[in-house]
Amino acid sequence: MKAWPVLGIVFVQTILLLAHWFIYHTWIVFWGDMGAWPMLALRAAIFLLAFSFIAAALFGFYFANRWVTMLYRLAAVWLGLLNFFFVAACLCWLARLTLALLGLTTNNPLLGAMFYSLAVVASLYGLVNARLIRVRRVPIQLGGLPASWRGRAALVVSDLHLGHVNGSGFSRRIVELAARLNPQIIFFPGDLFDGAKADATALAEPFRALAPPFGSYFSTGNHDEFGNAARYGEVLTRVGIRVLTNEKVIVDGLQIVGVPNGDSGYPIRLRATLESLELNPGTASILLNHVPNRLPIIEQAGISLQLSGHTHGGQIFPFTWLTRRAFGKFTYGLQRFGALQVYTSSGAGTWGPPMRVGTSPEVVLLTFE
């Protein structure tokens, strides 16, 4: 294993340990000592939970069986609970300080019970909300759009993260949605797979039923590249999804381009790739680029519309706020960068906690006007 993944794991594990310590410390201050045996059990549980997600993720990267899947799902749910327990602990201390400054009596157990209960409610809501895929309908106008495409619809499906949490049943749900929406073309702009060790063939097999008249197209995201991207590509090709790797196809006059996530991150490489494709500036073009980045280069290349995912809209609070600090207005939705239009989808699936709070899972139906 290279040094940087190890350092990343150590960094994340350190953050998780500190978060668990903070929650434990808050529990002690606000509820007090519960006795020798209960406290020993609490410490042991906190210690094991602190390592659960990293351990489950590592197991999930190398092994695929029902026990690993169960461990990963439980650890992922706990990671979401941890997030909201951490927020609850912060609110406990903030409320205690506020009451003290106002000279009011502080009821620590009541404060703790109130905020930690809200954390559980938020987590339960997030679990349910993450399974309710919305259909977002977006009309769009592109300069140079061939007349034959006017009135047609394209389905954009990003960030499924198929693996230990979202299995083949999730794939079937997407196929059923597509059948109901009846798009003429389907785009998968990355992170179709989670990158974990899994049966890619079984996960992708439901997509064989997709039958848009002008085909389905995919370009890799960062999680696809964490796993066996070549294997994923073979599997998708077999079920009828065209994998675009630094290439352009012309579909009934519309230029469709796909760039792998690993290449789009390098400005010089991306610029050279787009130049080599010899795009026709007078005809509409759509780029599948997983991350909503390198927009000056992409606009300069003459791309009409970029389809992205990656951000999940932040997925759960407070990461919704942090993601917007990182990507600005391109965190979500249809935005403009000069002559370039960018649609960033919040995605249909989840990564890590199978929860969504402050965002909604979606597929996007673009209607060309």
PLM regions: where:
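Non-catalytic terminal accessory segments
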Residues: 1-131
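Short, mixed-charge, low-aromatic patches
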Residues: 31-34, 47-53, 109, 128-135, ...
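Canonical alpha-helical transmembrane segment with a positive-inside/aromatic-interface signature
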Residues: 105-150, 154-156, 162-167
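Soluble catalytic domains of enzymes that build or remodel membrane lipids, polysaccharides, and related
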Residues: 141-369
